[in-house]
């Protein structure tokens, strides 16, 4: 690209000079190729006759920039020339090329919008509000392109708008306090934030809990932080408010810590000494009545870590914290305290995530919530139910801490209440007409393992294991295990599990028929969801009738077995020997802890 060797004698000759490789035109239909207007031009703001006819020679506008004086220049692609001959032309030289300028500005804005959408799709939840500044910048750029009019006065206005846009883009993101005061409706950003079911609870580090000293990682997140799956969920069915749902399941809002801590250590004499006092209770029961309970690892040997820890111990595990937070935030149809219910396409997903007990153990409150969720799933359009758990433990059976705490008042009455709760809980599984699929992600102990044969399909993680150490607990079997275990694995293996508490690995449980299939831990969730969606695509009538045919001869037998087991449990728990065995078990847990 070069300039002719002869010096032009007029302004018109200078503006119409073409590249050397092209033949010198005889008319004045071309524009200059120099990057700047020659110094010999006396009136730079007045376009020459050749430039006024430049529309017939301009092919397209390729780019634009600001020169040192702050004026806009456009990179022009000339007809009949390639990209090497593109020239930067001042805006005032393109008076008759407004169509090309508007077309370039339109394409430029579309590219900016596409880039913003691509960045927004890759952004994390914490970066959602950064789209506010991008959206505002895009709005200013759009206004700038519309306000661009050829002329000196309009050029100065466009320069001011572009400068303001660049200044806004360079500013750092607003602080968290300022973000909350911004009007998101004006910026075009729509953020769906689910509200917490319990109001008036404090928020520390983005989580709501009972107190800053012991903060539960599973509690609801702050309302200004949203997981990516929130906008993807579409709630179906009737939405129940916090008060109505709480009244329906018989629970009350939790304001104070549920489990007070004993200030001093619990000695062996407190647990083993069963000499009753004037009230008919042991010193250990007096301590429980006075202080509430003690911090005890409630799972059997083999569960090395509970699902809940102090938040300081979880600082180095951000992924697990996000997972728990995400599960709590994406519940779409119903809200509970100890479980999470998600209404999916064709099925209902129930996750154990207990707040009132350790390691997803079962107490009457948890059982009532599971029964309520199953009743709702039985009445809506769900084809099946998926039962799983949050954390590394599936279920640790009965919550003995909850039970012993209430035995101090009236042993016989509390034993009856606990037995009735188990009876109703197990009968709900027996009488449920739709298929129940269980995804066992970790250890299943006691009642958590006994209910598995009452379900239809059981998929297990490779790391899961199964144990029913009823003699260690000081109680008799429950959950219809006295009938279903011998049917599934034979009398010898069933007795070994029920009497001596043999622990089965996932592969052993699959070989004995307790588990349908075992998956690798890394792909467990994906494998389960693929198969669940396949089942959910089937005809619901076929699924329900198929289960009825399989279970028709067992329903009455299971209900009678459940009744017998609960009567025996009531008898054992109401006796002094039963309480003695339970206290010894808890003492061993204290020593192990």
Swiss-Prot record:
Disordered: annotated segments: 1-30, 110-158, 200-223
Modified residues (N6-methyllysine): 130
The organism's place on the tree of life at top rank: Eukaryota
Polar residues bias locations: 1-14, 133-146
Listed Pfam families: Chromo, ECH_1
Domain comment (free text): The chromo domain recognizes and binds histone H3K9me3, histone H3K27me2 and histone H3K27me3. The acetyl-CoA-binding domain mediates crotonyl-coA hydratase activity. The acetyl-CoA-binding domain is required for recruitment to sites of DNA double strand breaks and for binding to poly (ADP ribose) moieties.
Disulfide bond sites: none
Residue ranges of every copy of the Chromo domain listed in the record: 56-116
Other remarks in the entry: Interaction with HDAC1 or HDAC2 prevents coenzyme A binding.
Listed name of the protein: Chromodomain Y-like protein
UniProt-recorded Gene Ontology molecular function terms: chromatin binding; crotonyl-CoA hydratase activity; histone acetyltransferase activity; transcription corepressor activity
Region of interest (Interaction with EZH2), ranges: 56-304
GO cellular component, one term: cytoplasm
Recorded phenotype for the gene knockout or disruption: Mice show no overt differences in body weight, but males display a substantial decrease in the size and weight of the testis and show reduced fertility. Males show decreased epididymal sperm counts, sperm cell motility, and sperm velocity and a marked increase in cell apoptosis in the testis.
Induction: Down-regulated upon neuronal activity in the hippocampus. Up-regulated after social defeat stress.
Modified residues (N6,N6,N6-trimethyllysine): 130
E.C. code: 4.2.1.-, 2.3.1.48
Tissue: Highly expressed in testis (at protein level). Expressed in the hippocampus (at protein level). Expressed in the medial prefrontal cortex, prelimbic cortex, intralimbic cortex and cingulate cortex area (at protein level). Isoform 1: Expressed as 2 transcripts encoding the same protein, a ubiquitous transcript and a highly expressed testis-specific transcript.
Quaternary structure and partners: Forms multimers and multimerization is required for stable binding to chromatin. Interacts with HDAC1 and HDAC2 via its C-terminal acetyl-CoA-binding domain. Interacts with EZH2, EED, SUZ12, REST, EHMT1 and EHMT2. Part of a complex containing at least CDYL, REST, WIZ, SETB1, EHMT1 and EHMT2. Part of a complex containing at least CDYL, MIER1, MIER2, HDAC1 and HDAC2. Interacts with CHAF1A and CHAF1B; bridging the CAF-1 complex to the MCM2-7 (MCM) complex. Interacts with MCM3 and MCM5; bridging the CAF-1 complex to the MCM2-7 (MCM) complex.
Keyword DNA-binding: no
